[in-house]
Amino acid sequence: MPKNKKRNAPHRGGGGGGGSGAATSAATTGGPHRTVQPFSDEDASIETMSHCSGYSDPSSFAEDGPEVLDEEGTQEDLEYKLKGLIDLTLDKSAKTRQAALEGVKNALSSKVLYEFVLERRMTLTDSIERCLKKGKSDGQRAAAALASVLCIQLGPGLESEEILKTLGPILKKIICDGTASIQARQTCATCFGVCCFIATDDITELYSTLECLEGIFTKSYLKEKDTNVPCSTPNTVLHISSLLAWTLLLTICPISEVKKKLELHFHKLPSLLSCDDVNMRIAAGESLALLFELARGMESDFFYEDMDSLTQMLRALATDGNKHRAKVDKRKQRSVFRDVLRAVEERDFPTETVKFGPERMYIDSWVKKHTYDTFKEALGSGMQYHLQTNEFLRNVFELGPPVMLDAATLKTMKIPRFERHLYNSAAFKARTKARSKCRDKRADVGEFF
């Protein structure tokens, strides 16, 4: 087609191709139709996620984060929009239901709305249950993601227990269903771990969940019996999510159960370090570091028989220069396994600092890091806001009651933009110098040959 024809051609994105579902959702939310964005800021902030979801019109009002919501609308406006989205979760159109679920999830990730969610938890649970049972892959993923955020909003208690009792058997069925979508099973495994971590009050149910997740990720062990069979398969992403969810639940198990799991998996997990999937290697390495931390917490003189071979394998991964692997994967792997090696050999953990508002949280253990990473994946960019105001998360990380500051106090604490720019520039230079000492420059140069 000639260029002038292309220029004058009508735009196809807005008119008749949107469908009735999108028009209904735009009218319900009370805002103009917006262009669908394939990725959100939340997805961009999570480097280790294996999938990203597209957002339709019902969720577009929450894309700008809590600050924009505070400026553009009151609490009543937000709740009004959420009511419309909750109604759309029961729409006949599958795409509209999916977009509505994602919109509710985005809103609940950005704000703490305990009373609002408490009143409508049954409706939300019914919508999630229906999408998990009858929906396809994308719908099931959206429903499972919303279930995680719903439990985070409510925290531990009877309400979350009821949600887990309703959705738990369905999640378990999808996870173990070999005919279901891998992406849906992966999201359901993460959701099952998060919901069980928050809501379970029955030790038998906790052990049953652990066994369910074990039955998934231990299938990667079988690949190591034959060295000619590659460890990485289409199911690897599911195995990774199951392993990480299993590790999260292990942190709340009684000591007797932890000892049993350590005896069963301590000598099998290292086999996953030779997997050709970098995310599996990293997940296995971080899980091993956490298991060592738990074991040494129970027994200060804990002794691991194959320590020499394990440290040799970890050191090789921390200095990996394999030309057949992507440069980005190698850098990420080397960074993680330097910390894992220090944890196994020296019982050391590099303390991290998380800033949210006027507060700071220090992550000084593998258990705390893994817990933080799990909830960060569920909440995305809303994690900082929830750390400030969500009582459940503040109890998990031992932050105490929420700090209540008025607008005038916050304004006096705000640093001027120019001073922030100078501080960030100085911090950037210092960070660059510090990290340059840890980089293996010779390995990077060798990759070009």
Swiss-Prot record:
<dbReference type="GO" id="GO:0014009">
    <property type="term" value="P:glial cell proliferation"/>
</dbReference>
<dbReference type="GO" id="GO:0016528">
    <property type="term" value="C:sarcoplasm"/>
</dbReference>
<dbReference type="InterPro" id="IPR006921">
    <property type="entry name" value="Interferon-rel_develop_reg_C"/>
</dbReference>
<feature type="compositionally biased region" description="Basic residues">
    <location>
        <begin position="1"/>
        <end position="10"/>
    </location>
</feature>
<feature type="region of interest" description="Disordered">
    <location>
        <begin position="1"/>
        <end position="41"/>
    </location>
</feature>
<dbReference type="GO" id="GO:0030517">
    <property type="term" value="P:negative regulation of axon extension"/>
</dbReference>
<dbReference type="GO" id="GO:0048671">
    <property type="term" value="P:negative regulation of collateral sprouting"/>
</dbReference>
<dbReference type="InterPro" id="IPR039777">
    <property type="entry name" value="IFRD"/>
</dbReference>
<keyword id="KW-0472">Membrane</keyword>
<keyword id="KW-0539">Nucleus</keyword>
<protein>
    <recommendedName>
        <fullName>Interferon-related developmental regulator 1</fullName>
    </recommendedName>
</protein>
<dbReference type="GO" id="GO:0005634">
    <property type="term" value="C:nucleus"/>
</dbReference>
<keyword id="KW-0217">Developmental protein</keyword>
<keyword id="KW-0963">Cytoplasm</keyword>
<dbReference type="GO" id="GO:0005737">
    <property type="term" value="C:cytoplasm"/>
</dbReference>
<dbReference type="GO" id="GO:0005886">
    <property type="term" value="C:plasma membrane"/>
</dbReference>
<keyword id="KW-0524">Neurogenesis</keyword>
<feature type="compositionally biased region" description="Gly residues">
    <location>
        <begin position="12"/>
        <end position="21"/>
    </location>
</feature>
<dbReference type="GO" id="GO:0014706">
    <property type="term" value="P:striated muscle tissue development"/>
</dbReference>
<keyword id="KW-0221">Differentiation</keyword>
<dbReference type="GO" id="GO:0051091">
    <property type="term" value="P:positive regulation of DNA-binding transcription factor activity"/>
</dbReference>
<comment type="function">
    <text>Probably participates in neurogenesis. Could play a role in regulating gene activity in the proliferative and/or differentiative pathways induced by NGF.</text>
</comment>
<dbReference type="GO" id="GO:0042692">
    <property type="term" value="P:muscle cell differentiation"/>
</dbReference>
<dbReference type="Pfam" id="PF05004">
    <property type="entry name" value="IFRD"/>
</dbReference>
<dbReference type="GO" id="GO:0007405">
    <property type="term" value="P:neuroblast proliferation"/>
</dbReference>
<dbReference type="InterPro" id="IPR016024">
    <property type="entry name" value="ARM-type_fold"/>
</dbReference>
<dbReference type="GO" id="GO:0043403">
    <property type="term" value="P:skeletal muscle tissue regeneration"/>
</dbReference>
<keyword id="KW-1003">Cell membrane</keyword>
<dbReference type="GO" id="GO:0061629">
    <property type="term" value="F:RNA polymerase II-specific DNA-binding transcription factor binding"/>
</dbReference>
<dbReference type="InterPro" id="IPR007701">
    <property type="entry name" value="Interferon-rel_develop_reg_N"/>
</dbReference>
<feature type="compositionally biased region" description="Low complexity">
    <location>
        <begin position="22"/>
        <end position="31"/>
    </location>
</feature>
<comment type="similarity">
    <text>Belongs to the IFRD family.</text>
</comment>
<dbReference type="Pfam" id="PF04836">
    <property type="entry name" value="IFRD_C"/>
</dbReference>
<comment type="subunit">
    <text>Interacts with PSIP1/LEDGF.</text>
</comment>
<dbReference type="InterPro" id="IPR011989">
    <property type="entry name" value="ARM-like"/>
</dbReference>
<dbReference type="GO" id="GO:0045944">
    <property type="term" value="P:positive regulation of transcription by RNA polymerase II"/>
</dbReference>
